[in-house]
Amino acid sequence: MGVIRTIKRAVIKRLKLIYKHYRYKIYFPKLYRQCCKDNPVQENKILFLEMRFDKLSNSMEYMYHVMEESGKYELATAHLHFNFSRGREFTENVKHMIEELATSRCVILDEASIVLSCLPLRKETMAINLWHGCGAFKKFGR
């Protein structure tokens, strides 16, 4: 009985890794390229990407309000709820983020994002990471 359980766990673990690879390396990049093909970049659009929570962090919220008051930018937000949502809910959150990102000139985030790092950002799109961690753990846009 123990051998079967061990094999079952190993198979499930391997299937989860295959699914994760497919989602991040194939599905999300393909969806992003499709959205980019169908929509041009809006020069004044800025996307604020929050990885975990329902609202923007303090520094991002302040930047959002300052930019909103200036009236110069079209602002959008995306909340992925990373580690708090699973399956379809997370995929729907990422789809929304990708749709917004495809037309954004700039994306601002405050921590590392596995989702953003797997996407082939357009040359016109700039990623700004406000996270204060060391550079080895960051991936910046063009």
Question: Locations of the language-model features?
Answer:
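Active-site and donor-binding regions of nucleotide-sugar-utilizing enzymes
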Residues: 45-142
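Membrane-proximal basic amphipathic "stem/tether" segments
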Residues: 1-44
